[in-house]
Amino acid sequence: MNKILSFLLLLSSLVHSNEISFYEIKDSDDQSSEISFLLDKVSFIKSYSLVDPSRIVIDVYQSDLKSGVEEKYNYPIKLVRASSKDDLTRIVIDLYEYVNWSKPTQEKTDEGI
């Protein structure tokens, strides 16, 4: 019985998705903005941008959004929104116009990844 219980606990920890949550939008001194999300662990991320309508799309695989996100912000960011379905979290950054942007990075902090 203990072996079965141990196996089920191990299996449930393996099945548990990587939880992701919105953290902050921060303006930098060099007229750029940084949008941060927190992850439990490192994930595969695919990102791309669209010109019309102007937006940046970030897909975080094997993840589950803690709660829906819809954050309005100042120029050039119109709205940051996110949702999850089937272990995929999609983050969409709606923009007033096309901007130069950098691919997302993952950094370890005290709060998570």
Regions found by a protein language model. Name each.
Residues N2-L8, V15-I113:
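Short linear recognition/processing motifs and adjacent strand/loop elements at protein termini
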